[in-house]
Amino acid sequence: MNKVHSEIKTQSFNPFWNAATLKEKSRIDPNLKKALSYLWKFLKICVFLFLTVIGLWGCTQTYSEPWTVSNPRIGVGLEIGYNYGVTGDYRYDLTSSNIGPYFSFANYQLSYGPFLAWFVWPASQIILPILYQTRVPLTQGIDYGLNTILAILILLFIIRLITIGITLNSTLNTERMGEVQGKIAEINAKYKNATDTQSKKMKQIEVMHIYKKHKIKPAALFVQGFVTIPIFLIVYKMVSLTRPIKATILFGIWDLSVTPGTEIISDISRNWVYIFFVLLVVPMQIVSQWLPQFWATRRNRNAKTTSQKGLEQLKKTRRIQWILIFVFALFPVITPSAVGLYWFLNSIFTILQSYITHVFIVKRRQRTKTISRLDQILNRELD
């Protein structure tokens, strides 16, 4: 009777009892599981190293290979578009303006390096047909660049689909990190003035114990950064090299090929319209980085530290976060306006995704609490 009573309690506690029982019966061999785990870690390291090398290549390529340098002027520098005569539209057909060195990139080739060939060129081939098919022909009115907005939105959607797994994993790790932020701040405050090796070792042990208890993988918090930086470099090069984007005058006032900060400083009396561009893009960038932190703080109010030293450490951490937010917010000012447009649209995607994640986590917690209460009631009744 006691055995049956215990079995009923166990089954009542787990709302997914059938799935859990099936999983136990079909347990994978431990040695095979361990081997697969090592293989997966090795593959991830290879991918991260590959992305790091590609990112460094993208950053330094223009210094060693001048034929890959972009130029804001149409028909100057390296450009991606259609072969001359294919469309009959100067905004899409690659041709030199005879002002400076010119290099065309209409067909796939490795002569411009693996970064441009493997990443930038394929990305441009996604948006080029969209740009061309939704354009306003030269003889039928003014093109306000709405096709450019549409093309970047579609590219953003594809990027989000590709990186959604990494983003969600990083978000969940960040969420767990937020839940223990108070405890970590307490440990940092506890060993703030410690200089001996033993104290530093004890601090590391205590922190790792909290991470292990709450299933936090510190490395996972940096994974999104490893992916975000190469993506940014790809988009930056793509919008800088794609001829129709360089030719876009957004809403008839903002040239997407020029840098807002440079235009404002060079002649503010003529280029004052770029001030409004900056005032639109920069605040949106700040909000998109602040809102996820704000929602995480609201969700984890009970995880805050209570000691004075812990609060001081927490304030220091948040100060660093705000510095990073403002540093990243300056990027749209010092890069071409097309990059600023991408960051603006990307910020909207980030806010929407963060809100959906926030609602999902809140509802999941409420559901977990409801199940826990139900288990307590069932266990009391069985007792």
UniProtKB/Swiss-Prot annotation:
GO MF terms held by the record: membrane insertase activity
Transmembrane segments: 39-59, 112-132, 148-168, 219-239, 245-265, 272-292, 322-342, 343-363
UniProt-listed CDD domains: 5TM_YidC_Alb3
GO biological process: protein insertion into membrane; protein transport
Keyword Ribonucleoprotein (UniProt): no
Record-level GO cellular component terms: plasma membrane
Family affiliation: Belongs to the OXA1/ALB3/YidC family. Type 1 subfamily.
Function summary: Required for the insertion and/or proper folding and/or complex formation of integral membrane proteins into the membrane. Involved in integration of membrane proteins that insert both dependently and independently of the Sec translocase complex, as well as at least some lipoproteins. Aids folding of multispanning membrane proteins.
Subunit organization: Interacts with the Sec translocase complex via SecD. Specifically interacts with transmembrane segments of nascent integral membrane proteins during membrane integration.
Entry protein name: Membrane protein insertase YidC
Naturally occurring in which organism (per UniProt): Mycoplasmoides gallisepticum (strain R(low / passage 15 / clone 2))
Lineage: Bacteria, Bacillati, Mycoplasmatota, Mycoplasmoidales, Mycoplasmoidaceae
UniProt gene name: yidC
